[in-house]
Amino acid sequence: MEKNTELRNAWDFVEHTGISIFLTGKAGTGKTTFLRAIKQHSTKRMIVVAPTGVAAINANGVTIHSFFQLPLSPFVPESMVKPRFEYSKQKRQIMRTLDLLIIDEISMVRADILDAIDSILRRFREHNKPFGGVQLLMIGDLQQLTPIVKPEEEKLLSRYYNTPYFFDSKALQSTQYVTIELTKVFRQQDEVFINILNHFRNGNVTDTDFEILNKRYQANFNPGKNSDYIHLTTHNRIADNINDRQLEQIKEKAYKFCARTEGQFPENSYPADYELTLKCGAQVMFIHNDRSERYYNGKIGRITYIDKEKIVVTCPNEDEAIEVEPQTWENTRYTLNEQTKQIEGEVLGTFTQYPLRLAWAITIHKSQGLTFEHAIIDAHNKLLHLDKFMLH
């Protein structure tokens, strides 16, 4: 981080000021790494929240709705939030002692949700300051996932907001915050392709871009039986059908691995398949970042050995195979240590499963931010063949 000026600036703002920050940047620029560094090394009392259960689990945080006990209905500015039930004494203490609120995947957070958070924090802290005086670290890419707004919600919210995006929050508009955009991509080295991706991302596609991409179009492209291509599809059903069909064609013994859950872990927040059926020869994708850097979220490989107790995956152009161990994800909630007055994470439950999924196909939505060596995009029933594809 010391060598990256943008990350260093972000760290200084978080650690040495009370100014709120919107940290953005395309996939692969270090947003997740920065979040991990803040959690490990910052001296501030913090909590991490995210708009969805899966995003919260991946960030080792909790959902916005669960922590702030928000109702499912939209929030109308200048009204009072009515929590689903009364805040516990400890929850109130956490909010009163909080220094830093980290919101991951901020692009998915609606403006009214941010205003609801503001209303709650003002109630328990400094009433005249936005968000009760709490510093915000908002992390996300506005050009990836967007807020989910139902038609009836949009009709109501349009009376108060120009857009449903978080930056239209009344509270945020009255807050002085800085925007830091990370620009160096660490997962993609092809400069020509980076430029094309950025043109698509920013809506500035040129004729030259299309000419380069069209050279990759192969109408009758067949990836071959043992290739590591992955189909990017529009719907789960299509991806599941491709994966099931490909797995069935492998004439090897199938092994079923059931996840182990302990304590409280909501089913809609499961980070992996509860039942995982695999065979030797199956193409798989890692769905977790390995701390020892043997694999990363989105890395593709093929199972070269499997039994009831062991899975070995070999990745393209790598001599050393990976013996995969089950990964444990935690469902946490925040508590206040009465003695130290520090905010601590309490593990409510765990989910343990091999960090793998079948990977002949995946939906475009689930592939956000992942890096693939080879991909086939199903676009309007035509196949577009790309190398070194990183979806933005």
Regions found by a protein language model. Give the residues of each.
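Conserved ATP-binding/catalytic motifs of P-loop helicase motor domains
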Residues: M1-L391
